[in-house]
Design a protein with these regions (language model features):
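Enriched but not universal
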Residues: 1-12, 565-570
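Primarily auto-inhibitory N-terminal propeptides
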Residues: 10-48, 55
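Short, polar loop/linker segments at the starts of domains and inter-domain junctions
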Residues: 28-41, 100-114, 150-168, 327-328, ...
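Extended, Lys/Arg-enriched charged tracts that mediate electrostatic binding to polyanionic substrates
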Residues: 44-122
């Protein structure tokens, strides 16, 4: 037997594929060989699979050189260094995906090969993305991106433990002056005049220094108190009391009361309440509901409480009741739509377009590899990874968990799979080093390069990789499906079967349930063009998942429930 034939046989012996008949309600996949014929696998086969075992956690700097830990979990690496990116390496995947009637087949391989049945296993388009040339590997953020800023004041997305996922209108950029004490991440910073409080995420100094008490620059805050606008106020609110919406039942502890016009005595006081905490419900403004507090305060809501409260320019800013700096402005809530998120992902590498927001070929390849590894679409039911962060209360501000929460970085097995130590439905999952991916939950993630259109077709970044994904997609950069976007929302099953969508998971029906078929929820498009989100938020329950797809947002959407995961394709 020739050397080439021996090598080919070795490759084929390693190939494991999956198939599923989508007319059946079962969530389980079956296993097959390189030509789609059924096989039975021994327990633990995954540890010997070159693709799954080749997924390893590493850290990468701006030069793009990976440093690996002592095992696939990444032991020995510093996951909290904001100057590096904590990534998961995915080795090149060759393969094929096809349908026989209603049965879908996915057969991945570590090398290119022609099967005995004549099927060519070719390089997956994820490894042509962001440039158009073939790659031997790609890298995906271990975590949803957090906010970081470098010494030059450039904001960038960072995959690091301890970071709060960066989501829209949730982070506040605040100028400061007269800085005398350098803060620490997670310190609470409070305005002495406004009463507004936020948690420190990052900062940079543009002039002066801490030692000379004249540091000036920008500080970035999360979990900033909220603003509830009101009018027709007849009785003053009292700080420390709980404000309650008469019809919504929304609550929040009153931190400060700001009257901008009118007077309580004449029943026309207008302004806003600074509120903190509460039950997270939004106040009703159409029609305006009555807000009251326990001391008799009364007014009507003209704001729902989702807007961040402003600081007072030039006020003292304190940490633990000690003044550490002064506010340079009122603060700005940072928008974060898909294009902006992609820009912050690319900002880490400067102008290097090999960095960016995860694209659909990468995202859906990982989804198919998860199905291969775990054997089911009902991943939230697996004890090994749990349900993820999917059952926390709906909130007006970010209500998920931070990257690395509940000790998950150490709680997983040596292959990077497991769950945090917190309560079921409120603790993160991890699969092969990727937090919050296979169960969905915590936040939705933008997927740049797939564009839904209401009552229209899907536009998809061209699989040849020559065009860089953008939002909206640039003319000439994409292919389009023949099949129209599914305009019915629901738990979905089969995906579109056509050449343009060969490698992607675009819903073709809404015939599943939370425990049948795909087990994850699809929301139909509402805009032309729209933007695609994957995963699901911290309160979405069984609707979240690795195949959770939300096509109902506009390209301009910026929400505290939407973030993103970065990729680097060297």
């Amino acid at each position: 037997m020739g050397q080439f034939q021996v090598r080919t046989d070795d490759i084929l012996d390693e190939v494991v594929g999956i198939y599923k008949d989508w007319t059946q309600t079962t969530p389980f996949w079956s296993y097959c060989d390189c030509d789609g014929d059924p096989i039975t696998l021994p327990t633990g086969w995954q540890t010997r699979n070159p693709l799954l075992s080749g997924m390893k956690t590493c850290i990468i700097d701006t030069l793009g050189v990976p440093i690996f830990g002592d095992n696939p979990r990444g032991d020995g690496l510093n996951f909290a260094d904001k100057t590096k990116q904590v990534m998961v390496r995915v080795p090149a995947v060759y393969g094929d995906r096809w349908w026989e009637g209603d049965t879908e087949f996915f057969v991945p391989s570590r090398s290119p090969v022609t099967t005995p049945g004549g099927r060519s296993l070719t390089l997956h388009p994820a490894f042509h993305s962001r440039g158009g040339w073939p790659r031997s590997e790609l890298f995906v953020g271990r975590y949803y991106c957090g906010l970081a800023v470098n010494s030059a004041g450039t904001k960038y997305a960072v995959s690091a433990s301890g970071k709060q996922p960066w989501t829209g209108v949730e982070m506040v950029e605040l100028a400061f002056t007269n800085g005398s004490v350098e803060p620490a991440v997670n310190d609470y910073l409070t305005g002495l005049t406004s009463g507004v409080r936020g948690q420190v995420v990052d900062w940079y100094v543009s002039s002066g220094g801490w030692g000379t008490s004249d540091a000036a620059g920008k500080i970035y805050l999360g979990l900033v108190d909220e603003r509830v606008n009101f009018n027709t106020g007849s009785v003053a609110f009292t700080p420390g009391q709980t404000a309650t919406g008469g019809s919504s039942g929304a609550t929040g502890i009153v931190v400060a009361v700001v009257v901008t016009s009118g007077a309580w005595g004449s029943g026309d006081a207008a302004g806003y309440l600074v509120v903190r905490g509460g039950n997270g419900k939004t106040f009703t403004i159409s029609p305006s509901e009555v807000i009251t507090d326990g001391a008799g305060g009364a007014a009507k809501a003209t704001g729902d409480g989702t807007i961040k409260a402003p600081f007072t320019s030039s006020e003292d800013l304190q940490i633990s009741a000690s003044t550490v700096m002064k506010a340079g402005d009122a603060g700005t809530s940072l928008s974060l739509n898909c294009s902006e998120m992609d820009g912050y992902c690319r900002a880490y590498g400067g102008t290097d377009t090999r960095w960016g927001l995860i694209n659909p070929y990468t995202n859906d390849l990982l989804t198919m590899l998860a199905y291969l590894d775990l054997g089911t679409c009902n991943i939230q039911s697996l004890i090994s990874v749990g349900a993820g962060v999917t059952s926390k209360p709906a909130t007006r501000m970010f209500g998920g968990v931070n990257n690395g929460a509940d000790g998950i970085d150490a709680a997983v097995d040596i292959y990077g799979t497991g769950k945090g130590t917190g309560a079921a439905g409120q603790t993160p999952s991890m699969w092969r080093g990727l937090q919050d991916f296979v169960t969905g939950g915590n936040v939705y993630g933008f997927v740049i390069g797939t564009q839904p259109n209401k009552d229209g077709v899907w536009n998809i970044i061209h699989p040849n990789g020559l065009s860089i994904p953008s939002s909206p997609l640039a003319a000439g950069s994409f292919v389009s499906t023949i099949t129209q976007c599914l305009m019915s929302s629901g738990y979905w099953g089969a995906s579109i079967k056509e050449a343009a969508a060969k490698w992607l998971l675009l819903p073709a029906d809404a015939t599943g349930t939370n425990v049948q078929k795909r087990c994850d929820y699809y929301y139909a498009p509402n805009y032309v063009p729209g933007v695609l989100l994957a995963g699901g938020g911290w309160h979405l329950g069984s609707g979240a998942g690795v195949a959770g797809r939300y096509a109902g947002s506009a390209a301009s959407s910026s929400s505290r429930e939407i973030g993103g995961r970065l990729e680097f394709i060297p």
